[in-house]
Every structure is written in C-alpha cells, then in structure tokens.
Amino acid sequence: MTVFTPLVLVCAGGTGGHLFPAQSLAYALKDRGIRVALATDARVDSIAGDFPAEEIVTIASATPSGRSVLRRAGAVVTLGRGFGQAARAVRRLNPAAVVGFGGYPTVPPMLAAQLLRVPTILHEQNAVMGRANGFLAKGARVIATGFKEVRGVPEKATARRVHTGNPIRPAVLAVAETPYPSLDAEAPLRLLVFGGSQGARVMSEVVPAAIEKLPQDLRARLHLVQQARPEDLTATQNRYLAMGLGGIEAAPFFKDLPGRMASAHLVVARSGASTVSELAAIGRPAILVPLPGALDQDQAANAATLAQIGAALSIPQSAFTPDRLAAELVDLFEAPRKLTQAAAAAKTACILDAADRLAALVAETAAAT
C-alpha cells in the first residue's frame, strides 16, 4: 500500500538572511514526515548545499526598484517569466502548502500558489514587513512573524498574524547553550566582526582604524575574527598585522560562524533578522550597524529589539566612525560586567523552538487542504 506523504514548497531568496530560517523550517518539517521542495533564485548555489530539499527549483527573479525606468521594467518582465516557471512547478509538485520567507524571489511561486488555490503561509523575519510580503499578505492563510512587534502588517491581515519567532538553524542551536566566555583581567578579548552573508565594506573601513586607536594593552589581548569582502581581504589583513594583536583571522566567509559567535565576547555586525535572532539564541552582546538606505529601515527596527533591552548598541552607519567605535570598545572591554549583563539580556529575546512552532502551523494548514 502506498502511503501519501504531503509536500510543502518552501520559497526563499538565495541569501543567508532568507535561506537560513527556511532551512530550519525544512528540517523541522522533515522531522514531522513532511517532504520539502525549495523554490529560490540563482544566487542560492553557494549556500544551499545543506538544504534538506528533495528538489530545488530555480525561479527567475529581479527586484523592481531604483530610479531607472528601464531597469524597473526589466525586473517586472523577469518576474513575469518567473511566474510562468513557478506556476508550472506548483502544478507539477502539487504541494499541500507553500511557505514564503520574503524578498522578491518569493513573489512568483507564492503568487502562483495563491492563484492556483494552494494555501500559503508567509513568514516575516524582520521587525518591519517587507514590500514583497506586504504584497502577498492579502492572499495568505497565515502570517507568521519573527518579532513580537512588526510594523507594516496590512490592517486586514492582522487577525491572521501569529508570532512564532525566527527559526534558528541547527548549527546555531548546537551552540546555543555555550556559556559566556570568561572575562578576567588577563583573558583574551574575543571580537567577531561580520557584515551578513555577503559582507559589508564599512566594516573593513572602520574597524581596523578603530582598533588602531585602542590602548596597547587592549590590543595585545584582542583576538579578532573578521569577515571581509574578497576585494578588501588583503588590505584588511595587512593593516592588522602591524597592530600587535593577540590574534587575527580574516576571511570572506565563515562556514562555522555560529561557533565563532559562541566563542566571542562581543560581536560587531549588521542587524539582519537572522543575525539578531542568532545573537539572542547564543546570548552574545553586540554593536549593531543597521544597513542604511532601506526604504522601510528594517535593520534599524531589528537592532532596536536588542538595544531596547540592553543586549546591544545600535549605531547608525553615519555615526559609525573609528573614534566612536574605539570609545565603545574601550568602555565595554574595561567594564566586563556590561558585557555579561548584555549577554544575559540577549538570551531573553530568543524563541529557541521557533522552527517547531512554525512547522506546526504549516502542518496544520497543509492538513486542512
């Protein structure tokens, strides 16, 4: 006898911020005996190796933003092509439900599912609803949110909103109970600097100049791990080599980033939703530099969720100068109690079983079809 096992189509853009929580949900669904397929865009190749999907469908996608009318028009044409690809994939896969994690790459498959009357669930990772999710919210059965307070949810959709938290990937859960490292007077000071899955040039410009301004005794204790874009890597490494640091490691990408976060006394980073949620899960204090220029200022809102409880400092990029960063580092490293208190505060902001909560919601929705 053939036993029917439902399939859920998970839709996520090909960057870590969207893909990591989608991956966590996929593992939780598979634990429930639910099959998973992934719809994403062409950027996924470098980071989708561990995604537990029986099939990965690449959908044409583009973002219709910017001042160029031609570029926006071209993006709309690409999204239309992606819609055709997505509609064929949804018909072929016949999913019991489709889950979208935001970003324009999710629009074609989510919209195709809605038009084909397949139930859809949105997950909004940020503290401000993105434009793609806002567009899709009207047709979604459920809107799950990563943060308790989320701005921009359409008024007519608020009754369908459920706070699940942001799904935490297994690699983070594996180190989530790591105690905060000792910070006695002679212990190494472990600083981790990164800018999201694609790096951030501002970190390579500001952080080395700030480290140069630290007192020599702090520099001698400092063990620095920093993500740098490939084009910035050599210059960044060369600047640090002359500073007399206790240790330095720089690379374009760290596959073992959760473990490095757990080893750190302090993290300097952007404030994407995954970064903020993982800092809370592991319980590490941070200096957060929200990505500027976003129309909805989602990273600033994300950072505020930790800053408001004393778990992080949020510094706008316009104020993120070598002098400001050096002053904050000296203040924190010379007053270890501030760091330990911030670490404890961060822990209060996390929902460790968010993936299971979201999986239960998806399974319930799929079973109702």
Swiss-Prot record:
The enzyme's E.C. designation: 2.4.1.227
Membrane topology per record: Peripheral membrane protein
Key word rRNA-binding present: no
Segment forming the signal sequence: none
Entry's localization field: Cell inner membrane
GO cellular component: plasma membrane
Keywords annotated in UniProt: Cell cycle, Cell division, Cell inner membrane, Cell membrane, Cell shape, Cell wall biogenesis/degradation, Glycosyltransferase, Membrane, Peptidoglycan synthesis, Transferase
Reaction catalyzed: di-trans,octa-cis-undecaprenyl diphospho-N-acetyl-alpha-D-muramoyl-L-alanyl-D-glutamyl-meso-2,6-diaminopimeloyl-D-alanyl-D-alanine + UDP-N-acetyl-alpha-D-glucosamine = di-trans,octa-cis-undecaprenyl diphospho-[N-acetyl-alpha-D-glucosaminyl-(1->4)]-N-acetyl-alpha-D-muramoyl-L-alanyl-D-glutamyl-meso-2,6-diaminopimeloyl-D-alanyl-D-alanine + UDP + H(+)
Name this protein carries in UniProt: UDP-N-acetylglucosamine--N-acetylmuramyl-(pentapeptide) pyrophosphoryl-undecaprenol N-acetylglucosamine transferase
Lineage: Bacteria, Pseudomonadati, Pseudomonadota, Alphaproteobacteria, Hyphomicrobiales
